[in-house]
Amino acid sequence: MLRFDVVVVGGGHAGIEACLACARTGHPTLLITQKIEQIGHMSCNPAVGGLAKGHLVKEIDVLGGEMAKATDETGIQFRRLNDTRGPAVRSSRAQVDRQEYRSRMKRTVENQEDLSIQEATVEEILIHRDQVIGVKTDSDETVLTKALILAPGTFMNGLIHIGLTHFSAGRMGDPASIGLSESLKRLGFRMGRLKTGTTPRLDRHSIDFTQLTRQFGDEPPLPFSFSTEKIETEQLPCYITYTNIRTHEIIRSGLDRSPLYCGVIKGIGPRYCPSIEDKVVRFADKKRHQIFLEPDGRKTTEVYPNGISTSLPQDVQTRMLRSIKGLEQVEIIRPGYAIEYDFVDPTELKPSLETKKIRGLFHAGQINGTSGYEEAGAQGLMAGINASLYVRGERPLILKRSDAYIGVLIDDLVTKGTAEPYRMFTSRAEYRLHLREDNADLRLREMGYEVGLVNEKDYRIFLEKRMAIENTLSRISSLRVNPTKENNEILHQWGSATLKKDSSLREILKRPEIHFKNLFDFDRSLEGIPESIQEQVEIQVKYDGYIKRQMEQIDRFKRLEDVSFPEEFDFGSVIGLTTEVMEKLKKIKPHSLGQASRISGVTPAALSILMVNLKKQGYL
């Protein structure tokens, strides 16, 4: 009988980060996956990052995760979105080579010390006295474990739809996991049904690219990982085209065979990534919808048409695509499809991602109702870290909303739950000026080092960078510029007001039209400062007042977060709460007064009652 400290079920983006985190912190770990060759497979688009998602990938990286490094090594196009806007909403995105990304992740998992892999399907979770003790596989083998992380993606009772044809599958070409879902139901977990979809895959040779608009990556490309010095790979272009009125007519003509509009699909789909048939029906006044043709890799003819996810019958998909400019002769390699799958209500979880019902059982990824590789990877990493800490009998690592987008993601899930596939946006983060991509290492690298996932070399580089930022800020604060004719001429050529008195370089940099590079004219020695330091210093100086106000908000918020409820606290015994508030508190079981304050319906008066009760019982 096999025994491991941690067992991880599922070799997708959540499962990879989870098993690597456990093994890298010295715990013998087993990854159970249906097909070893599918470890790290990108089931949908061949891309990482995007608005707010790029923030998650950077945070995964500085905490010691793998996604950013793999993206830098296998990327084929890199772009920074919202580059002309403020630093809070700038986000990185990369097209990757789908096959290379999968191979890179598979190699990493296979070569990781303390990590074993088994090809199997988990049929049952084994429990003793409300604590996980192991799993049983489809070969009737029992594997014992101290902690179990479930990261099954869309595989639990997965059902694929193409037109009115449907069949059981976890994704195209892979069987669904039936037993695991049934096992969770028997354990009494609240479960629901969600739906997602993907686009048809196209043959590159059948596309007329001369009719399409090319979209290039940024030069030079900016890496995702703080450990990557630079990216030297040749970038590939993407192409842009649009649907048209004829396309929309074809789509409408096929709605009588659409599983979405015939009531066949019961699961709730992603609000922010609707199918093309959903777009045409919901936005009937729009004459066209944008499509990005994204190469699947360097050595494949497969093309991913981003923006045209569909579950229409294949004949309708073909006619629809051939009505689009540049795709008049297109051949479909694989049709688009929708997939329904089971998920567990994430309010069943503690902020550590451990379930409230079963000790030692953790959930990560789409099982929690999220969509996206990045959201999955973030949860997998945190589940892995906290499973390791659980095995060692230590307190979990819980990122606050003011610490990271990962903290926002998990807090939203465990506090509010979700009725539709959840995706991250910058608008979900109330402290987004503090939670920027550029300062992810300054916010979280120390934590990654403390939990044992950041190596000495990367930690030393981080310390040197932090010191360089502090030294540069000190330097430009002390260097003075006199209001001489020569200096004022320099300012005039930049379109900046002349000086009337001595000013520091820091004061000059505060001006919106001045950038760090402009300071070189006053002090040539600044030219040797790395660009990453220049960018960080410029942001900190220009947004100093806003950042200070946000940090004051965070301090006020922290006072509520620091008031914790003990595990045994009985919300049902608190006198003075309304029935509605009491029921919600008993369901969510918030870990802190801060989390309680974010539960719908919990009023300031209710928070005061809880505070008084904590004091009465001697917890404060």
Task: Name each model-derived stretch.
Residues 2-14:
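Beta1/beta-strand and adjacent pyrophosphate-binding region of the FAD-binding site
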Residues 2-4, 138-147:
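Core beta-strand elements of the Rossmann-like FAD/NAD(P) dinucleotide-binding domain
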Residues 9, 142-153:
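Short hydrophobic core segments
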Residues 20-124, 151-171, 175, 179-181, ...:
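Conserved N-terminal/central alpha/beta ligand/cofactor-binding core
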Residues 37, 182-318, 415-488, 492-499, ...:
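An anion/pyrophosphate-binding glycine-rich loop and adjacent beta-alpha core
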Residues 126-142:
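Conserved beta-strand-loop-beta-strand element in the redox core of flavoprotein oxidoreductases
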Residues 304-370, 398-411, 530-584, 589:
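A glycine-rich dinucleotide-binding beta-alpha-beta segment and adjacent secondary-structure elements
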Residues 428, 434, 445-606, 612-620:
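Extended, charge-enriched "interface" segments that sit outside catalytic cores
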